């Protein structure tokens, strides 16, 4: 409901602001208030709740009209010092001086945002002062632009490009999915800002000048062009008082930017573009995609209607369009662009496939359009519509917050509406929009007509075929070399002297210690005395005629329950690569009397999905043993008990007779895995380096590493061509399934207290009897790798990911805490500057991993190789041989404790608490570890550095482009490659 703005309410409004309206969103139990700053017109949305994790975000409408990366580089440079805080790196310094639960900055296609979250009020005030000054009074030092954006340096007398964003975007644009998105947008949006890459195209970034950056800041970073959003238990008045005092009072009215509608195509177009691959084998590497430009996103009824259309067409494998794309025969998987994108000014709709060939472009287009015609020709089944509405309600009600803070998730959901001068309250309060849609659904052809109007009859349609090109990467590298050579030929001695002087000035700036007294901070005295751990109840129910533990947690879940079955995994299953394949199948193949298409629709109608996964940890006191639990998961609205029945059915009666479907699922897994490698290169590098340092590390390298991707590709080829190989696979999966049915079980239930007894009773009734094959089974043994070579893996990428690993101790060992602090200390004090600021990598650092029982250094999207490994070792010598400051130790500890204390969603905290108990991470264990962290000393850091790092030889690993093969061989790496 919307609340009238009364005189009583207005008395609580800060005098610099005008209250426009208030609206209570019942489904979320939040009061949304919209305000306008009287002088500048800045908009403020406050989401009032009783949560003590308060969230702040300020966003600007940024609309670049080129691909130089102006908005992205400005996002970085604005955080490099401001009027009140003239230190070189306030953003990363505040991460260390804070108890934040989230700090970041984002550059989207047409907005830039600066969010943070914290549970500590003093910390909130500190971060708010730094963020507001960075946003509205950034210094924009030319040397920071050179560091973060783009610069030329001389190496052996020849010019080279350097810059953090330059290397970041080289890494980002090596991913085929990123190339697909940006090349498609180039055609779908011929004239507006979406035509360009706001993050920056590496070939265009060198064209950006410092003066252009400053001009962009002056136009876009003004309160009149800003949206403020806040969430939590602080009042809007006290927040606005700070906005006014710290920033807004200095401004008069400025320009507000508005988005422009795209010029519409008169007829559909077809285009072919290419992307780089490092192989001459081009078979099955083409992407096909169809995209439509839809109306503006401001019509909430149409927006929700198109979401329903997306659900009808694409929700699951039984949905007609997804089913066609998955079974068409000319592609290996659906593509990365699928469904409605309503985050821009005008909505878009995508569908596509990957793992195809260029000659199938017409078949793809004709097949998609035929499906759309079939669906649009008749009324949509009302049961399917109800199932999609159920998914929308479930998504609306669910309280997330286990990755991104819950309040920030809500804010980001509504931000696009506010940025485009639309109404974000309509997005938060979807119940009222659903009521409008239900009125429209009384016309049985309403959704069918939306398909006809906005897809079939819409001339603004782009079909793109993205084909692999083994020469593209080489051509891009040669073009960059030629450009730099041309620059070098024109350089006079005076030009070279100027470049050298600027390089020296940047190095001096990077080496000059910041005056940390200029920045606010929290200290260890502000850390909560105790670790908050959710407490549950241990019940007993009967499962398969045996007493079975049920872990019950009461939580404010907003009308949703979460049910899991927890199965202790036998050791031979843990190490089997086939186990991961079984988890791909559950919920995706049929079960019992239901084929997979029927089961897909059932899941959509009664649950938030069915899942099978694994929770794996090293034993707390023995690195050679694994604590392993299979997790069967579902969630649903509390009135829908059918999800409990469906979870048991899908696991107990999982079918292995749908051969085409099983091959299809494994093929999809392989194709999607291949397309996502470059975003996780640092994780793979650390996994490779530490692969033999614990039993779990070895298992993960063997079963989830890059070698496992090659193994899966070979397996898919075998079972596609050889019936006997397929039969062997199914026999192995059946053996694993049989063992899991026999294995000991527990249950986990998270729900609201008043619903718990009914749900416990239902779980008892459903799981009372279990069909178990008690025959003993032996699994196929797989040979485990055990060498400690320095290993390099070659993938499709333009930058490197480096890692070094040292054998460390189990997490229960007293040295685990100082090793954790050591990692943060080296990152803060040395590695960030050496690897990111000076080396030009997008990121780098160190970590102690209690599961791999290793201490690991890493870099991310790194232009260097050998120099980075030298920096890893130099960081240890820096610690041991230079004077260290106590404040650096406090900062390292603060960050670790903040991470440990970070809240999750109500359900997420309960699930985390239960899993911790399963793996012997008891409350006493967790509190002891936290207490040890708080008491680590500098002497402890030096001791463990000598013991674990100086006295060992590290195992090194690199994930790198194919072009680095020769250099890596010269450095002594054993070369592997992703096929």
Predicted regions and their residues:
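M16 family metallopeptidases and their MPP-like homologs
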Residues: 53-63, 89-137, 144-152, 178-203, ...
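Active-site His/Glu-centered metal-binding helix of metallohydrolases
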Residues: 70, 74-78, 582
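Non-catalytic terminal extensions that flank enzyme cores
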Residues: 2-55
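Extended, regular secondary-structure scaffolds
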Residues: 215-217, 227, 236-255, 378, ...
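In a subset of proteins, long, contiguous C-terminal domains/tails are tracked
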Residues: 934-979
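Hydrophobic, small-residue-rich alpha-helical packing segments that form membrane-like cores
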Residues: 152-225, 229-247, 251-277, 282-284, ...
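Non-catalytic, conformational "gating/processing" segments within enzyme and secreted inhibitor domains
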Residues: 214-246, 729-763, 953-954
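His/Glu-based metal-binding/catalytic segments typifying zinc-dependent metallopeptidases
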Residues: 47-50, 57-59, 166, 170, ...
């Amino acid at each position: 409901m919307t609340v009238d703005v009364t005189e009583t309410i207005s008395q609580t409004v800060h005098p610099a602001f005008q209250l426009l309206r208030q609206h209570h969103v019942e489904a979320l139990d939040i009061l949304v208030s919209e305000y306008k700053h009287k002088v500048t017109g800045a908009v403020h949305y406050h989401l009032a709740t009783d949560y003590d994790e308060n969230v702040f975000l300020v966003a600007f409408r940024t609309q670049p009209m080129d691909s130089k990366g102006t908005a992205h580089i400005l996002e970085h440079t604005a955080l490099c010092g401001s009027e009140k805080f003239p230190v070189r790196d306030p953003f990363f310094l505040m991460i260390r001086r804070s108890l934040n639960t989230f700090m970041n900055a984002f550059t989207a296609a047409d907005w830039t945002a600066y969010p943070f979250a914290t549970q500590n009020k003093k910390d909130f005030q500190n971060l708010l002062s730094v963020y507001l000054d960075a946003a509205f009074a950034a210094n924009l030092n030319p040397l920071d632009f050179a560091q973060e954006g783009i610069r030329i340096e001389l190496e052996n007398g020849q010019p080279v490009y350097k810059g953090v964003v330059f290397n970041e975007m080289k890494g980002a644009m090596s991913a085929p999915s990123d190339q697909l998105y940006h090349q498609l947008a180039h055609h779908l949006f011929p004239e507006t800002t979406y035509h360009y890459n706001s993050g920056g195209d590496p070939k265009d970034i060198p064209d950006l000048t410092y003066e252009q950056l400053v001009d962009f800041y002056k136009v876009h970073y003004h309160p009149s062009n800003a949206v403020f959003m806040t969430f939590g238990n602080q009042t809007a008045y006290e927040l606005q008082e700070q906005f006014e005092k710290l920033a807004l009072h200095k401004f008069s009215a400025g320009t507000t930017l508005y988005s422009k509608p795209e010029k519409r195509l008169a007829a559909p177009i077809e285009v072919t573009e290419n992307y780089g691959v490092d192989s001459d084998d081009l078979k099955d590497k083409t992407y096909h995609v169809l995209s439509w430009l839809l109306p503006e996103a401001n019509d909430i009824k149409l927006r929700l209607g198109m979401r329903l259309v997306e659900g009808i067409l694409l929700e699951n494998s039984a949905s007609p369009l997804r089913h066609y794309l998955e079974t068409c025969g000319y592609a290996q998987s659906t593509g990365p662009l699928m469904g409605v994108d309503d985050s821009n000014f005008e909505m878009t709709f995508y569908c596509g496939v990957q793992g195809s060939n260029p000659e199938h472009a017409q078949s793809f287009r004709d097949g998609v359009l035929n499906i759309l015609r079939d669906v649009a020709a008749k009324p949509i089944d009302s049961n399917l519509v109800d199932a999609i509405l159920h998914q929308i309600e479930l998504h609306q009600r669910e309280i997330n917050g286990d990755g991104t803070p819950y309040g920030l998730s809500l804010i980001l959901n509504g931000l696009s509406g506010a940025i485009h001068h639309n109404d974000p309250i309509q997005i938060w309060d979807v119940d009222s929009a659903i009521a409008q849609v239900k009125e429209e659904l009384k016309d049985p052809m309403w959704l069918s007509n939306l398909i006809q109007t906005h897809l079939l009859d819409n001339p603004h349609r782009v079909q793109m075929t993205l084909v692999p090109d083994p020469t593209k990467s080489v051509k891009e590298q040669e073009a960059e070399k030629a450009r730099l050579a041309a620059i070098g030929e024109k350089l006079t001695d005076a030009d070279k002297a100027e470049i050298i002087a600027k390089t020296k000035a940047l190095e001096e700036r990077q080496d000059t210690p910041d005056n940390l007294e200029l920045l606010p901070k929290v200290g260890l005295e502000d850390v909560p005395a105790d670790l908050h751990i959710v407490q549950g109840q241990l019940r007993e129910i009967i499962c398969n005629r045996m007493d079975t533990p049920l872990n019950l947690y009461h939580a404010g879940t907003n009308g949703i329950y979460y049910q899991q079955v927890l199965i202790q995994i036998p050791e031979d299953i843990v190490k089997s690569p086939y186990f991961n394949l079984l988890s791909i199948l559950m919920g995706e193949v049929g079960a019992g009397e239901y084929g997979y298409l029927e089961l897909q629709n059932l899941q959509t109608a009664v649950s938030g999905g069915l899942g099978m996964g694994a929770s794996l940890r090293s034993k707390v006191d023995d690195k050679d043993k694994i604590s392993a639990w299979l997790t069967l998961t579902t969630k649903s609205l509390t009135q829908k008990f059918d999800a409990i029945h469906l979870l048991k059915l899908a696991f107990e009666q999982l079918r292995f007779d749908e051969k085409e479907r099983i091959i299809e699922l494994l093929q999809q897994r392989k194709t999607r895995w291949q397309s996502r490698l470059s975003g996780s290169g640092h994780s793979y590098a650390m996994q490779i380096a530490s692969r033999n340092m614990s039993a779990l590390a070895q298992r993960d390298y063997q079963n989830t590493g890059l070698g496992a991707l090659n193994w899966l590709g070979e397996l898919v080829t075998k079972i596609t061509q050889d019936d006997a190989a397929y039969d062997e696979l199914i026999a192995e999966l059946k053996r694993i399934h049989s063992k899991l049915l026999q294995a000991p079980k527990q249950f986990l239930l998270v729900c609201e207290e008043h619903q718990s007894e009914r749900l416990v009773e239902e779980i008892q009734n459903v799981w009372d009897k279990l069909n178990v094959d008690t025959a003993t089974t032996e699994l196929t043994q797989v040979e485990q790798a055990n060498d400690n070579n320095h290993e390099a893996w070659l993938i499709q990428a333009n930058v490197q990911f480096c890692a070094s690993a040292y054998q460390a101790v189990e997490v229960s060992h007293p040295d685990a805490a100082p090793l954790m602090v050591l990692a943060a200390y080296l990152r803060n004090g040395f590695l960030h500057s050496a690897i990111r600021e000076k080396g030009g990598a997008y990121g780098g650092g160190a970590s102690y991993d209690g599961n791999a029982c290793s201490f690991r250094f890493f870099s991310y999207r790194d232009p260097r190789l050998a120099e980075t490994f030298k920096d890893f070792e130099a960081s240890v010598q820096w610690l041991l041989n230079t004077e260290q400051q106590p404040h650096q130790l406090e900062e390292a500890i603060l960050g670790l404790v903040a991470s440990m204390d970070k809240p999750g969603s109500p359900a997420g905290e309960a699930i985390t608490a239960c899993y911790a108990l399963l793996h012997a991470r008891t409350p006493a264990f967790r509190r002891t570890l936290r207490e040890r962290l708080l008491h680590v000393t500098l002497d402890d850091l030096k001791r463990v550095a000598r013991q674990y790092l100086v006295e060992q030889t590290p195992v090194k690993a690199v994930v790198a482009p194919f072009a680095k093969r020769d250099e890596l061989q010269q450095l002594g790496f054993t070369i592997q490659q992703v096929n």
